[in-house]
Regions:
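CN hydrolase (nitrilase-like) catalytic-core segments centered on the catalytic cysteine
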Residues: 1-96
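Cysteine/selenocysteine-centered motifs that mediate thiol-based redox chemistry or coordinate metal-sulfur cofactors
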Residues: 105-136
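A short, polar/charged loop-to-alpha-helix boundary motif
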Residues: 92-111
Length: 136
């Protein structure tokens, strides 16, 4: 994924939206890293899935003692420091709101330019496939 992220970073995103099924603490740490690395606000939206969200005729038996299958963890992360500025919202439905001053992202990109001089294109060669052609 680092090369895929690098390709997106080159476009200069200001807000990175990351939906996922991963509700682990490791995911939140990853999103904090991506905020700093990309210089973009990160809005992460892990799934909150209570057991009553499944229909009675769901084809796979669910463990009767498990009440939540995805605890959520929606959060907004600031790009300069990786600080969580809203959320995380666990174990319930809700709306996570943050005031995102996009100038902070521009400042973060000037401080840590992951696709500029830090990327060292003079020292590293990379090649990406032309995705408009069918795979062989």
């Amino acid at each position: 994924m680092p090369l895929a992220r690098y390709a997106v970073y080159r476009g200069g995103p200001q807000i990175w939206v990351a939906p996922t099924a991963d509700d682990s603490d490791g995911w939140l740490a990853s999103m904090r890293h991506i905020a700093i690395e990309s210089g973009a606000f990160v809005v992460t939206v892990p799934q909150f899935i209570p057991s009553d969200a499944f229909p009675d005729d769901f084809p796979v038996p669910l463990p009767p003692d498990k009440q939540v299958f995805g605890r959520g963890g929606a959060a907004v992360i600031e790009p300069s420091s990786g600080e969580v500025i809203a959320g995380p919202l666990y174990n319930g439905e809700g709306i996570v709101v943050a005031d995102c001053d996009l100038r902070r992202g521009l400042h973060a990109k000037r401080w840590f330019d992951s696709v500029g001089h830090y990327s060292r294109e003079d020292a590293l060669a990379r090649e990406t496939a032309n995705l408009t052609e069918p795979a062989e």
